[in-house]
Amino acid sequence: VVAAISYSQTGSYQQVRAWQQATAQTPGLLARALDPQAQPLNEEEMARLALGLRTRLQNDAGNVEGWLMLGRIGMVLGNAGTATGAYANACRLDPKNRDAALGYAEALTRSSDPEDNRRGGELLRRLVSRDHTDIRVLSLYAFSAFEQQRFDEAVAAWEMMLKLLPAGDARRAVIERSIRLAQEK
C-alpha cells in the first residue's frame, strides 16, 4: 500500500493521467479549434490538443490534415521541433500539398539552426518558382532571403509583391520600407 501511494505521488502516474485526459479531450478541443465561432483555445488547451493529436497520429500516421494541424499548433506554441517534424511528415505523405510545404518552409526558416534556415530557403525558392503570384509564399521568401543576407533576392520578391497588391493596400508601405532597408545593406 505504501509503495502504491508513493508511486502515485512521485511516479509517472500524474503524467500518464494528464496524457489520458488530453487524449480524451482531443475531439472536443479539435472541434473548438476548427470552429471560427467558438472561443479560441488558450495555450494550455493548445498543448493538450498537441499531445492528443500526437497520440492519434501514432495510430493514424497517414493523416496529412492531422500532421498539418499539429504543425500549426507547434508554431503557435513556439515548439520548433513539433512544428518541423509534423510539417516534414505532412510533406513526406503529400509532396504536392502547398500548405504542408509552406508550413515546413516557415518552420525551417524560423529555426535557430543555420542548416534548417538554408533548407527552408531552398524549399521557398522551389515554391516561388512554381507560383510567383502567391503573396504568402513571396512574403516568407523575402523575409527568409533578408535574414540570410540575400538582399537582392529579398528585394526581387518584395517588388513582385508590390506588383500583385492593390494600390491602397496597407502592406505596400511596409514592403517599400523593407525594400529601402535591403537596398541600404
Residue positions per predicted region:
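Long, contiguous interaction/recruitment modules in multidomain scaffold/adaptor proteins
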Residues: V1-L51
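Alpha-helical adaptor scaffolds
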Residues: A33-N42, M46, V64, L68-V76, ...
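Alpha-solenoid helical repeat scaffolds
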Residues: L51-R54, A88, R125, E159
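Structural marker of alpha-solenoid helical repeat scaffolds
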Residues: N59, L93, R130-D131, L164, ...
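TPR/TPR-like alpha-solenoid repeats
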Residues: I73, A107, S144, L164, ...
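Register position in tetratricopeptide repeats
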Residues: V76, R110-D113, E147, L181-K185
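TPR/TPR-like (Sel1-like) alpha-helical repeat modules
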Residues: C91, F146, F151-D169, R177-R180
